[in-house]
């Protein structure tokens, strides 16, 4: 997750660490957790649940930020996507239990939620989402495959059981009645991510006839997203359609929307590509799966929880 690397550079925080021989000692772990102002849990789901249970009932000070999927739709935990809604940042600031979002979910929700809230995207829409991620998203086992020097795939799709672990939060926080059909893939690059959602105007959107007649749907979608993220520090809506491609740093070789252009940042970019004649649209979100999709989001939530500039230590 790169959380320690990001926090080690800070001079406003004191990091608490257990000696190697105490890291499986429950009493030592409990003491460290209860001594911390903020604890970030970078653990598998079951271990994160166990760690959260170590907080003493009388401890009303320690803030937990859980990077696992264990608590993301738990009503007793606050979803750690500050840009989710106008009041989400305040909810995070007031919470002692913050669930860090999943990387894929961050991109999908960033695209869908504003359009649902604006009354443009039907909550009943049966969406499809596809995504490509760097192999670091698979943790040490997958990193070992790609970096071990042996043969490996240049690209690989997965989750063909159609039950990816991010689906519950994708449905819940996009305010959809059903989760999308989600088709993720891993590429032969370490970091970076693009999440794409295609839309059919008449099937998925609630549009006034005059918008369809005038061919103004793309502008309407773009305006809704721009309004939602106005003033956001880390989320930006790029110029509409192919105009975004004219910015040389965004599209290399004139043809590719690269997933790795935001690596080592906490930024997320949104693109809107529509064909008014065909009445179709593709929304795309680009982010670093280890940045806004993981450690960057955790640090942003930590900053909000501590009441300091949410961008401290982030790019």
Language-model features: where?
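NAD(P)-dependent Rossmann-like dehydrogenase/reductase catalytic/cofactor-binding core
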Residues: 267-315
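Short alpha-helical basic/polar micro-motif
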Residues: 96, 113, 219, 296-297
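C-terminal substrate-binding/catalytic lobe of Rossmann-fold NAD(P)-dependent oxidoreductases
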Residues: 3-30, 42, 123-131, 135-283
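Active-site catalytic microenvironments for nucleophilic, acid-base chemistry
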Residues: 114-118, 200, 301-308
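PAPS/PAP-binding and catalytic site of the sulfotransferase fold
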Residues: 98, 197, 298
